[in-house]
Swiss-Prot record:
GO biological process, one term: viral translational termination-reinitiation
Name the record gives this protein: Eukaryotic translation initiation factor 3 subunit G
One term under GO cellular component: cytoplasm
Species the sequence originates in: Homo sapiens
Basic and acidic residues bias (residue ranges): 221-234
Modified residues (Phosphothreonine): T38, T41
Amino acid sequence: MPTGDFDSKPSWADQVEEEGEDDKCVTSELLKGIPLATGDTSPEPELLPGAPLPPPKEVINGNIKTVTEYKIDEDGKKFKIVRTFRIETRKASKAVARRKNWKKFGNSEFDPPGPNVATTTVSDDVSMTFITSKEDLNCQEEEDPMNKLKGQKIVSCRICKGDHWTTRCPYKDTLGPMQKELAEQLGLSTGEKEKLPGELEPVQATQNKTGKYVPPSLRDGASRRGESMQPNRRADDNATIRVTNLSEDTRETDLQELFRPFGSISRIYLAKDKTTGQSKGFAFISFHRREDAARAIAGVSGFGYDHLILNVEWAKPSTN
């Protein structure tokens, strides 16, 4: 196999290794052996040593923008930077468009259009949701019913009025006999009712002890005269008003809130359907005083309630 010395042209990779491991720049020496697109092997005139740096160039072709810049690194080597951008058209509100046309000031007075990473931080869009007052009330923490009972006395001692049982009172042996003796001296009742002259002795205690049946005529209170409710009923009839033209969704609580400002109410009767439970359209309101009922008629009659005009008048007295 013949051997001999021959001159070989160094490859492009060897030249890159000899020049150094700096991959940021492309010098004119490296471009000598690289064929250009036009077939010319001469380097770009902008990268020749001693030539001034040309200004940046922008070329827009449709929606593609190409920006070409020339810079010099720390070693004095020239290099070219080519950046390609895709232009997108986005719709924005008029207020946002006007803010983009504002002139920059301060440290960003000479910055190009767009945000500067040194002074501006671009983050994700945050959407703000406003809640109503009802939702705000629902978000409030519900009060614990046990916290209300903390300040109340559940157990009260009959001797010292402390918050413990009477059987566990530490002053039971000292204050108990003293209170009993004082009550006897003052003639206070100790729980047993004194018998009045001519009054029959109640048989209720005997019934509890023996368990025998006691007829109603011999029970406690049998000698007292019964009270008639007829006068009270007549008073209710005199202070009762009749409300008509009510909606089907009306409830007794609605009538209570509507007529409560005029005076004290004794009873409310709302006529309802037996099957559906809805209002039949009329109701009766009884006040304790006739003056309050008169003011309710003057104030509510002709009043618009639940998209209906109410009619209020005096109720006819019952014939029973």
